[in-house]
Amino acid sequence: MIKWPWKSQNDALDAGLPWQQALDIPLLSSLSAAESQELRQLAARFLRQKSLILLQELQLDRLNRCRLALLFCLPVLHLGYEWLDGFHEVLIYPDPFVVDDEWQDEFGLVHRERMVQAGQSWQQGPIVLNWLDIQDSFDRSGYNLVIHEVAHKLDARGSGEANGVPPIALREVTGWERDLHAAMIQIGDESDIVGAAAASIDPYAASDPAECFAVLSEYFFSAPELFITRFPALYQRFCRFYRQDPWQRLQQDNTTSAVQ
């Protein structure tokens, strides 16, 4: 287990970490100064309170540790740090890893097989990631392994099970389920027509509601323009849940850049 050397130190030492450089990635470029400062504070707390376990001789420098913490905290920027209390450890492999998976088919038969995984979110357990795919999570590609696994934890908060419906007001549940299932059907239909490789949204989202929520959370933060175009009503529901509007933030950033 790797214990960060600053875990027991105070915020003054947190300030010595390369936060400004860590924030300088495309995914975070549209944050306001106030949001960047708040995210930095959340990420510093994350590094102090979570145990990051580097496996198979993986090593991360201070900059990449900071960037990883920023990714973990982006989804809870306006929800609050306590939304990350569903886990205490993050296990990180250098590359995608092999697991012994067990699943039950529609006939009740249990199957066991070895599978390659990019990440996992264990119910009432750690988050497991791999550094190779984390490195593809800093841009605006629509892919973000960290946000995907954090979304599973947020989904399971309250009920204890990830089912595609995160903790929202009861009056919102019916509409949420309707719009999420409609998106799953559209994503699956597109994949059937053009093929998985050519689909605009990862077809994995069509596999079940929990994966749809996690995959669309990736697009919500890293490709909001695609999400809002394809599923405008569902996008607004995500805005209300996460208490953020990445598309609007991106528009404001583009306007500011154009003026400058």
UniProtKB/Swiss-Prot annotation:
Keywords: Aminopeptidase, Cytoplasm, Hydrolase, Metal-binding, Metalloprotease, Protease, Zinc. Binds 1 zinc ion per subunit. One of its GO terms (cellular component) is cytosol. Its EC number is 3.4.11.-. Its cofactor is Zn(2+). It is an enzyme of class 3 (hydrolase). GO terms for biological process: proteolysis. Zn(2+) binds at H111, H148, H152, E211. Its main location: cytoplasm. The keyword Protease applies. Pfam families: Peptidase_M90. It is found in: Cytoplasm. GO terms for molecular function: aminopeptidase activity; metal ion binding; metallopeptidase activity. Interacts with Mlc. NCBIfam families: PRK15410.1 (NF011939). Involved in the modulation of the activity of the glucose-phosphotransferase system (glucose-PTS). Interacts with the transcriptional repressor Mlc, preventing its interaction with DNA and leading to the modulation of expression of genes regulated by Mlc, including ptsG, which encodes the PTS system glucose-specific EIICB component. Shows zinc-dependent metallopeptidase activity. Belongs to the MtfA family. This is Mlc titration factor A. The gene is mtfA.
